[in-house]
Amino acid sequence: SACLVGSEMCIRDSIISLDLVVELNGYMGDSCITVPVGHTNKKNAQLLKVTEEALFAGIKQAVPGNTVGDIGHAVESYVRPYGYDVLRDYVGHGIGIEMHEDPEIPNYGTPGHGPRLEEGMVICIEPMVTMGRADIITLRDGWGVVTADGLPAAHCEHTIVITGNGPRILTLRD
């Protein structure tokens, strides 16, 4: 079986990312999940699992006093032992009245570098992890993106609030 995404065909046993933004009372929320189309193979299943685990590794670093470099380093350090890479062309971001606000939250970085996280900040952490190289191609629709080497990639995202009691995930799913 297959499904259509825009004008592109989505083939069974592949994976697809669903990135959703919702506005409520003038404020934005952003979340993404990558899911299999039908059943998936072990390699894709591992990619999905590692990407979600990398998201939570980054979220653990989202505390007052840490930096965006701490988050990015946690994400990249988590995926590298699996032979995976992270996209550098797309990053997480602050969010609020606008969907994309400062600061940018890369999925790579140096601990202690970049903007410092403060209590009350609302950010989106969104690892985009590739099984191969991080080079990408934008599809003809101008929106969809695939890896240049044709290997799978996965994307997970949560909107979180930085609090003195640790990160609070606003987009947690059941």
PLM features: residue spans?
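Residues that recognize and position ribonucleotide moieties
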Residues: 2, 69, 88, 153-154
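Hydrophobic beta-strand core residues of beta-sandwich domains
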Residues: 3, 62-63, 117, 154
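A broadly tuned preference for mixed-charge, low-complexity surface segments
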Residues: 9, 64-80, 138-143, 170-174
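Conserved, well-structured core segments that form or line functional sites
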Residues: 23-29, 40-116, 122-134
